[in-house]
């Protein structure tokens, strides 16, 4: 093993706003779905558990700020990385992703992600969604044939030879790739690249959906959004009268409203009672989400007020992943399944998200909070203070975006 280890970066780019789906599986690769895989419920539960764990750490690190991420993008990228991990490094990654390795084999996990990627990239007239992976490889770096094959077949990954010694040119190449795949929403995923970088893995998600019941722009007006007890901002507030799934959770002290897209996927808006945000965040679990979804019932909302906004985020996840138990990849990694030698170490995990909400629907993700007023005959929902949002794909029960909107006026 060399005394000085070379850099390996994991990037997570995501977005919304697009015109077409992108299919990354090479045309010459025929996949036969004959392998055992984790059942859909188990994969969704593990991904949801990881999603909430990741969100909680980001919320702690970014108090009183907007928090927007795609936990699915992070899960896919780490699972992709685990293809080349060995020993305790592999165990840390998979257990960090909330898989019980006494019940599930590594091979089953990879085939489950393969199946998920294929399902997500199915063409649809109602939804613009594509998920893809890419490898940027130092020109003289020799990857193992097994890793290249598994990356293509299981994770639909593209590969690009890259000269990282010219770090600015390499940075531009990767940022331009992500910008193109996200229709310009993620413009600068990497702000810096070391000349010692050998390999960069990128995952992106592109998502755009239309509300099943769109808002009328003529009814959008400026209104107050209460960021905190002593801060109020003006935001464009959309309004709508509709029947939609609703649940009042007395046990956890929150109100939920679900808005569906034409694809029947949905955005779940969650408003904790005054002073209950931290308590609610602490109780976010897969079981909580399942209970909420089973409890939602159609109700007539006579006046729904929802802010129109566009926000972005960019996170370095090294410390947060370490808090979740994924540590060895940053210091004492065994990633010998990539090159055959254990001299690669992950130097940076970067995650970027861009989210837009308007009268037509969601680009990237939607974020809104819910404040509710109720009379005997009328339900009025005012999205006018901090709230949580989860965008869930119906067929796979995958949370593609998760966040907290504290101030919708901040880009």
Curated annotation (Swiss-Prot):
Homodimer. One of its GO terms (molecular function) is serine-type endopeptidase inhibitor activity. Stable at temperatures up to 70 degrees Celsius. Incubation at temperatures above 70 degrees Celsius rapidly decreases inhibitory activity. The record marks 377-378 as: Reactive bond. Glycans are attached at residues 100, 180, 230, 264. CDD domains: serpinA3_A1AC (cd19551). It is found in: Cytoplasmic vesicle, Secretory vesicle, Chromaffin granule; Secreted. InterPro entries: Serpin_CS, Serpin_dom, Serpin_fam, Serpin_sf, Serpin_sf_1, Serpin_sf_2. The keyword Transmembrane does not apply. Belongs to the serpin family. N-glycosylated. Detected in all tissues examined (at protein level). Abundantly expressed in liver, kidney and spleen. Lowest levels were observed in diaphragm muscle. This is Serpin A3-1. Residues 1-24 form the signal peptide. SMART domains: SERPIN. Keywords: Cytoplasmic vesicle, Glycoprotein, Protease inhibitor, Secreted, Serine protease inhibitor, Signal. Stable in the pH range 4.0-12.0. Incubation at a pH below 4.0 rapidly decreases inhibitory activity. Its main location: cytoplasm. GO terms for cellular component: chromaffin granule; cytoplasm; cytoplasmic vesicle; extracellular space. Potent inhibitor of the serine proteases elastase and trypsin. Moderately inhibits the serine proteases plasmin and chymotrypsin, and the thiol protease proenkephalin-processing enzyme. Does not inhibit the serine proteases cathepsin G, furin, kallikrein, thrombin, tissue plasminogen activator and urokinase, or the cysteine proteases cathepsin B, cathepsin L and papain. The keyword Signal applies. It holds the Pfam family Serpin.
